[in-house]
């Protein structure tokens, strides 16, 4: 199995937690790393450092004690601001800077950031050059295959990235116009891999060990970014890693382990964010963890009304105790 290198860093495997706003916070990053991710990437941080004083932004800038390499994603459309944001994040502990040109969200694209940048290749080149020159750590880039299906310029952008000194390129197999609808396509990613010599990572709909192997075989990529499939299933990294190494499946996670992982995650969320914010953020994660289990919808309705950390943890323990007593088995 090929070794993945980003600048001076060698990853322990080919699986990376994709950056997701509102999801890949410090508690989730650390959990995914413990459960098999070779690298994790922070939530997107705005390049406008004037906005970093909000509590939400300050929490996104905390990386103390995290495993190396610490990769931080920045987003924006102004080369000078992105360069400054990169420098500031390195001062705060970032060891890799990732530039977001892949987010399709309207509130990002309307600010000429994220995947909106793919429409302006000259600006793309200017941004990449500015950020690479600004820092002495590896800079990576995340893109989509293009703006829409008639304008798949991923190969062109990949070549610009390589020329600018980008150390690795992640490609989501949809266009900006696709958002998250339909199925990801990997032909463009395969073409990008053939067109450049820097490491290329595939992203999009990689939700099982078999799909992971199929995408690697189809594209020849160096690594995979896993995003939405890890929500409520952070152990997917060890499952895929084991399958890629051995060709065999690990047993499904038993309910007692799922309970233990979820309670650990809740405790870290409550500690990191404080009670009020932690309780609120925990709700979506609990929904993801329990989505495939019987009675999850009814449980979520009452869980989302709980207002304190102790009640949340007690409620989760009761949910799992009832299912283990009923012999409901394992998680998906």
From Swiss-Prot:
Gene encoding the protein: dusB
Entry superkingdom: Bacteria
UniProtKB keywords: Flavoprotein, FMN, NADP, Oxidoreductase, RNA-binding, tRNA processing, tRNA-binding
PANTHER family on file: TRNA-DIHYDROURIDINE(47) SYNTHASE [NAD(P)(+)]-LIKE (PTHR45846:SF1)
Enzyme class: oxidoreductase
One annotated GO molecular function: FMN binding
Presence of the UniProt keyword Oxidoreductase in the record: yes
Disulfide-bond pairs as recorded: none
EC number(s) on file: 1.3.1.-
Role: Catalyzes the synthesis of 5,6-dihydrouridine (D), a modified base found in the D-loop of most tRNAs, via the reduction of the C5-C6 double bond in target uridines.
Matches recorded under InterPro entries: Aldolase_TIM, DUS-like_FMN-bd, DUS_fam, DusB, DusB-like, tRNA-dHydroUridine_Synthase_C, tRNA_hU_synthase_CS
Cited HAMAP family: DusB_subfam
Name of the protein described by the UniProt record: tRNA-dihydrouridine synthase B
